[in-house]
Amino acid sequence: MAQWFNCTSSESSVVNESELILTSLAGILMLGVGSQWIAGRLKIPSILILLCAGIMAGPVTGFIDPDQLLGDLVLPIVSLSVAVILFEGAMTLRVSELKEIGRPLLMLLTLGVAITGVVCAAGAYYILEFDLTKSILLGSILTVTGPTVVGPLLQHIRPIGKVGPLARWEGIVVDPIGAVLAVLAFAGAQAMESSKLEDAAFNGVFGFLQTFGVGAALGVLAAMLLRVMLRRHWINDHLQNPFVLMMVVLTFTASNLLYHESGLVAVTVMGLVLANQHQVAVGHILRFKENLSVLLISSLFIVLTARLDLQQFANFGWRGPAFLALVILVARPLSVMLSTIGCGLPINERLFLSWLAPRGIVAAAVASVFALKLGDADKFVAAAFIVIVGTVVVYGLTADWLARRLGLSIANPQGVLIASAHSGARAIAEALKKLNIPVQLVDTNPSNIRAARMEGLPTLFANILSQHIHDLNLGGLGRLLALTSNDEVNVLAAGRGAELFGRKESYRLGINSTGASRRDASSGMLEGRVLFGPGATYQELDRRFGEGQVVKATKLSTNFRTTDSCRNTRPP
């Protein structure tokens, strides 16, 4: 009887432990995705809601204990997740943008990183009273910025000029640089404490070159292998996304095994090369990785913030805010203003970049990984999270205002993104241009693009449905006109316009089809507001321009009727 009772009790504890694990995992997923949804509804940086949710679930209520839940798996899971996030970020970069931003980007990634690291390390040493090793390590980690925070901010602000692509490139490329610097700084600081200054300097430079050399080489090889396999259709369509994910994990792991901490470099280079080749389409891969990254970022922030010790924040006292002020008011402005001297950037763009360096998931992950190698790890992680939370709050609440004050953003942009560059679309664009309204024509037809360029209209040879539209310089643009000859494309483009500018500013031509599409259109089930009225289909627009009708601009008044402008006027 006693034996039976012990057996039953043991089985019950196993069941309870299993249920606890399941509840915790479900809670992480629910809090992560739910926080993203709430942030999207409130139009605030999602990291703020994620941080609050993680703190409430972890140190406040004890609902989630990542160390008990995942044990030794915490750091490997964090590392692999960051690798996938950086791969996805690198796939949004376009090498063609380097023609305009190459020089300032190079200076930001070299001199700018060095200045940021030195100032932050000095602040950690003198303000936070860290020892030399921790100070140098924290300074290296804080050289990174948060692409997962910068991206949404840029989509909201839509700055004009070079600052948009420059901030995106810096945010993604500097992350593996910062991670590698942290590894080398940790080893170098330990060597310096052992009075091996010459060895520390030599090993640091040599290790940096080796890390980037091994990582870049393996990243290029992996991307080229994937390109060949996709081009020759060696991978079934339904397996392409999971296969690429497997390749990312394999490349990251293999690179780290070949040379310590070179994996992040490898996956970043892999994503960059894969995105900029022109032999196979990778749009579907990018969309899959974007969805996966959202899930990973959400879960990671919940896990990492749930591990925080809130008492460590209180222990800093005035030193925490003082260190944050140094990072925001001294380190970033100093690094940008000095590193961009003579790079051709206007002063307003340099000032804006000086106020845009939020830290995000990479800084949190790297700090959490290295904290286990240090004594007093909770204090080190708390210092990193002070900067993460502080920079997100400060930049998230003020960057939009500063961009408008500097003339880099418009509160109510009137520019128009036109999907298609056929003759009718060009006529509308020309009329808008004469009114000094910015226009941008997007088309995949080379003939239409050439004709638009010959007429002096800004053009982009791209698919309006491509995810890369999110990464364009949309400064001054505030609405979309979907004018293609395909009703379905117009509806989908209107959906993309709603993502960029909001549903209110997304327009499309009327539906010409009958049956289900007509019923959907009349019931409001289709995306986009109908431009000019339901009868204004592409066929009707094409007929009118074919008859010689032209586009004219007329000031509205109480005596003016819209029908007065609809005249069958032939051009002289």
What are the functions of these language-model segments?
Residues 2-412, 465:
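Transmembrane helical cores of multi-pass secondary ion antiporters/exchangers
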Residues 345-346, 363, 369-572:
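Cytosolic regulatory regions of ion transport systems
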